[in-house]
Amino acid sequence: QFQDGSIVTISGTSMLTFADVGQKKLRLKQGAFTADVVPQPVGKPMIIQTPSTVIEVVGTRFEVEALQAFTTVNVREGNVRLKHLVDGNAVDIPADYRVIAEAGGDLSPMPLPAAENYWKSQLDVQAGGFGKWLPAIKKRPAAQKALPFIPVNNPNVNLSLLSIPVSGRSGPPVVLTPHATFRVRGRLHDSAQVHFGIAVSYDNGEFAGMFRGDLLKKQPVSEIAEEKEFEAVYQLSDFTVDPCVREKQDSLARTPDGLYLDRLWIFTDTGRSSGLMVHEVELIPGEIR
């Protein structure tokens, strides 16, 4: 939060640097953030630089996602000016519109897509998030592979962790319904408990909390088949507040029902590499029977 009350919230594995010496200047090297910017001084808009664009903000609510190949800007309120670094072309993006800026692409603003309740990962292309993306080969589909991760506040724990971004950037926003179910398919070296969490936001893009689907009921061990494959299911009604945000819970949502799904993460806690990789995550707006 800046001194004037403007708020920028990063998500996932994002890299953001900033300065505020007379004018706010941010550089999003990769990842995504949401922002609620109060009106800025005349002639001194907030400047945001991504690998491919420069964005000028006077006062608005918006979201940005930056990858090497393109930048996505969703505007909720106000007006945002985007300039493409490659050719210098610029566009003003009004409220309730978005632009996906890529080399040689059209900068015409498009209406923000309507929210959906069903979602399925698209791992045939690089997903972003945390982990190593593996393209499809003859023996298996494309996958996001977990990487070693040691929590800062618990250095004795060694997890195998991956995350996948979901909502409100290059695709339509995804809203969670009370009886929704997540189904995860992937591979493991050995049978293990597969833990699952989500991050959610309000409809204005503001961070709303983090929840875990494996704490209320102990997640059973995911047994592997002949090809080391596993499937795990998580009911939204079983999700509880993630311990890492429990101290801030008074200011966050108590349940994920009706909120926007921003990203998800999946991990094992076996003390060693589990070989965890995920081929597919599916959100179904109703219980799996």
What are these regions (language model features)?
Residues Y234, L264, H279-L283:
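Extracellular beta-strand elements of beta-rich domains used
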Residues V57-G59, V75, I93, L261, ...:
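Hydrophobic residues on conserved beta-strands that form the core of alpha/beta folds
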Residues Q1-V64, A69-H84:
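Short, small-residue-rich packing micro-motifs
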Residues P41-T50, I55, V64, F70-T71, ...:
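Short, polar/charged, low-complexity connector loops/linkers at domain or secondary-structure junctions
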Residues L134-G168:
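Short carbohydrate-recognition loop motifs
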Residues P256-W265:
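Noncatalytic modules at the cell exterior or secretory-pathway interfaces
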Residues N154-K248, Y260, T270-M277, I288:
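Extracellular ligand-binding interfaces
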